[in-house]
Amino acid sequence: MFDRELEAFGFEKTDDLIKIVPPDLFAELCQQSVQHLQRQRSGVDCQVIFQSFQAAGVLISEDELRKIIRWITTLFSTAAKYNVTCEELLSRLISKLPKQILQVIRHVWNEEGKRLSELEKSRDLLPSGELVDFQWKIGMAVSSDSCRSLNHPYVTIELKVADYSGQITSKVFELTIPEFQNFHKQVKEMSSVLETV
């Protein structure tokens, strides 16, 4: 079952990407992914890690980095789900990954595997999306496609959300004042409902 889940996820496609990642950066990715699975952190901030990769001279796109993060998160959560030993885990990867990467996986699984497996028994290990940060600011439209929008205030909202794999993404959108007031009203309604629970 463990093998089938890994195959269904498409691990074969990510192996080549992982081969170009230096062991120290791979270890950092593993650590952040495990902390996310243990709910010690909201997620893995892909943009910050991507900057580390660029500074280290690793030529990889942000999209490819996201695939690697998903690979790591799925590897450890699936291994925890099936409570595999370190040797079982490595036996499935030994022909596909470099020795240094396997050493990192061995170290992380020996340190955290038991705890992840225990957490898996008590709850679903893959958390749902989580709001990490909420920022807003008021602005004034100084250029517009329609003259009616000129010199009208608007609210810019930035949401940082961690998805199930721990990747943090930013979503930015603008609302007119009436749209923001409606948004505010709906959030207040949610808050009052939560107070009754």
Swiss-Prot record:
Origin superkingdom: Eukaryota
Keywords: Cytoplasm, Nucleus, Transcription, Transcription regulation, Ubl conjugation pathway
Database matches in InterPro entries: COMM, COMMD4/6/7/8
GO-annotated cellular components: cytoplasm; nucleus
COMM domain mapped to chain residues: 130-197
Main location per the UniProt record: nucleus
Cellular localization per UniProt: Nucleus; Cytoplasm
Pfam families reported for this sequence: COMM_domain, COMM_HN
Family note: Belongs to the COMM domain-containing protein 6 family.
Subunit structure: Component of the commander complex consisting of the CCC subcomplex and the retriever subcomplex. Component of the CCC subcomplex.
PANTHER family per record: COMM DOMAIN-CONTAINING PROTEIN 4-8 FAMILY MEMBER (PTHR16231), COMM DOMAIN-CONTAINING PROTEIN 6 (PTHR16231:SF5)
Job of this protein: Scaffold protein in the commander complex that is essential for endosomal recycling of transmembrane cargos; the commander complex is composed of the CCC subcomplex and the retriever subcomplex. May modulate activity of cullin-RING E3 ubiquitin ligase (CRL) complexes. Down-regulates activation of NF-kappa-B. Inhibits TNF-induced NFKB1 activation.
Protein name as it appears in the record: COMM domain-containing protein 6
Organism: Xenopus tropicalis (Western clawed frog)
Upper taxonomic lineage: Eukaryota, Metazoa, Chordata, Craniata, Vertebrata
